[in-house]
Swiss-Prot record:
Organism: Natronomonas pharaonis (strain ATCC 35678 / DSM 2160 / CIP 103997 / JCM 8858 / NBRC 14720 / NCIMB 2260 / Gabara)
Signal peptide (residue range): none
GO biological process: chemotaxis
InterPro entries xrefs: CheD-like_sf (IPR038592), Chemorcpt_Glu_NH3ase_CheD (IPR005659), Cytotoxic_necrot_fac-like_cat (IPR011324)
Entry keyword set: Chemotaxis, Hydrolase
Family statement: Belongs to the CheD family.
Protein name: Probable chemoreceptor glutamine deamidase CheD
């Protein structure tokens, strides 16, 4: 959706909305308002290119005509394809995730919240694709904002309780 040109100015800030993504080689890619949604960053440290997707639901039904970035599973596919188009190597891809909080209880019958299911699906789908999950700041009941340094893949996570973490 919001795949942006790789030739970004190093001071450029790219904002990713819910059910959207961006890919860049420089600047900062950010998203905010992460409750049960995820901020899923995938990057190639060797190529110096990163992507950030903001999915809100775990899995896409094959008949669903909503944007693939809305879902964790198909959102991963979209950003991997975009990264490969920007020179990344599939073998070098790494991932970091943030979000998945239980801020609203719309849990399933088995007791898992949407946030829990988003986290679980992200871990499964990344593993199935051979993408190493190297950092996460997930769960709990706090909202989050994520900022990705596109050149390095460093992820800064700011929580609504004032805590900050760099992944």
């Amino acid at each position: 959706m919001a795949a942006l040109p790789a030739e970004s100015d190093t001071s450029e800030r790219i904002k990713v909305s819910i059910a959207d993504y961006a890919v860049a080689e420089a600047g900062t890619i950010s998203t905010s308002g992460l409750g049960s949604c995820l901020g899923l960053a995938i990057y190639d440290p060797e190529a110096g290119v990163s992507a950030l997707v903001h999915p809100m639901l775990p899995r896409r039904d094959g008949n669903d005509d909503r944007p693939p970035e809305r879902f964790v599973d198909s959102g991963i596919d979209v950003v991997v394809d975009a990264l490969l188009e920007h020179g990344a190597s599939k073998a070098s891809l790494r991932a970091k995730i943030a979000g998945g909080a239980a801020v609203v209880d719309f849990g399933s019958d088995d007791g898992d919240s949407i946030g829990d299911r988003n986290i679980e699906v992200a871990r499964e789908e990344l593993s199935d694709r051979g993408i190493e999950l190297v950092g996460e700041e997930v769960g709990g009941d706090c909202g989050r904002t994520v900022k990705v340094d596109a050149a390095t893949g460093d992820v800064n996570v700011s929580r609504t309780d004032g805590e900050e973490t760099t992944l």
